């Protein structure tokens, strides 16, 4: 399988930089996978789990939004937050979800819709992290 270069950058750090076989991205319009030779594209990333495959190794990284750009030079993801899944503090993440739930009643209209959508994404991440942690 052909490889391509992948950079995952957040404001705090370069979370990943190297050659990979595949990257699965939680896109705002739906999840998508990137392989070598992928057509150029720029996509918005929703909160979710990004999966990096390099050989037999898979690494899961929690991203909380951002932008992905595929070009002839490879894939670059500029993430608002990027944390390797094993480094996520599950109690802190649960507390964040609880705070988000408590803030829902004060929102209306489009703001309410966006808050519910973001909460759903966070709950999906939490579910996957809890499921993964058990295996």
From Swiss-Prot:
Its main location: membrane. The keyword Cell membrane applies. It is found in: Cell inner membrane. It is a peripheral membrane protein. GO terms for cellular component: plasma membrane; proton-transporting ATP synthase complex. Keywords: ATP synthesis, Cell inner membrane, Cell membrane, CF(1), Hydrogen ion transport, Ion transport, Membrane, Transport. GO terms for molecular function: ATP binding; proton-transporting ATP synthase activity, rotational mechanism. HAMAP family: ATP_synth_epsil_bac. Belongs to the ATPase epsilon chain family. Produces ATP from ADP in the presence of a proton gradient across the membrane. NCBIfam families: ATP_synt_epsi, PRK13448.1. This is ATP synthase epsilon chain. It comes from Rhodopseudomonas palustris (strain TIE-1). The lineage of its organism: Bacteria, Pseudomonadati, Pseudomonadota, Alphaproteobacteria, Hyphomicrobiales. The gene is atpC.
